[in-house]
Amino acid sequence: MKLFLAIVLILMLQFLSTGAETSDNHASRSTTALRDWLLGPKAKRCAVTHEKCSDDYDCCGSLCCVGICAKTIAPCK
């Protein structure tokens, strides 16, 4: 199942990266937005409230900002 999902994701990314244009502007905007979301810089978010975090003080409770707000073994910076 994981292999199938990985293959589908790779094919979708390959299709999006070829710059294939569609005649429908909405579809073109949707694929551009999806490509930007998949390949763009990843925003750090709180896992509970899904709010963006840029540092540990933006996180919920004792969570650390490490890609998302998450519980870590080592203390936060």
UniProtKB/Swiss-Prot annotation:
<dbReference type="GO" id="GO:0099106">
    <property type="term" value="F:ion channel regulator activity"/>
</dbReference>
<keyword id="KW-0872">Ion channel impairing toxin</keyword>
<keyword id="KW-0800">Toxin</keyword>
<feature type="disulfide bond">
    <location>
        <begin position="46"/>
        <end position="60"/>
    </location>
</feature>
<keyword id="KW-0964">Secreted</keyword>
<protein>
    <recommendedName>
        <fullName>Conotoxin G11.1</fullName>
    </recommendedName>
</protein>
<dbReference type="InterPro" id="IPR013141">
    <property type="entry name" value="Conotoxin-I_CS"/>
</dbReference>
<comment type="function">
    <text>May embed in the membrane and bind to the voltage sensor domain of a ion channel. Does not induce paralysis when injected in fish, leading to the hypothesis that it may be part of the sedative nirvana cabal.</text>
</comment>
<comment type="similarity">
    <text>Belongs to the conotoxin I3 superfamily.</text>
</comment>
<keyword id="KW-0732">Signal</keyword>
<feature type="propeptide">
    <location>
        <begin position="21"/>
        <end position="45"/>
    </location>
</feature>
<keyword id="KW-0165">Cleavage on pair of basic residues</keyword>
<feature type="signal peptide">
    <location>
        <begin position="1"/>
        <end position="20"/>
    </location>
</feature>
<dbReference type="GO" id="GO:0005576">
    <property type="term" value="C:extracellular region"/>
</dbReference>
<dbReference type="GO" id="GO:0090729">
    <property type="term" value="F:toxin activity"/>
</dbReference>
<feature type="disulfide bond">
    <location>
        <begin position="59"/>
        <end position="69"/>
    </location>
</feature>
<feature type="disulfide bond">
    <location>
        <begin position="53"/>
        <end position="65"/>
    </location>
</feature>
<keyword id="KW-0960">Knottin</keyword>
<keyword id="KW-1015">Disulfide bond</keyword>
<feature type="disulfide bond">
    <location>
        <begin position="64"/>
        <end position="76"/>
    </location>
</feature>
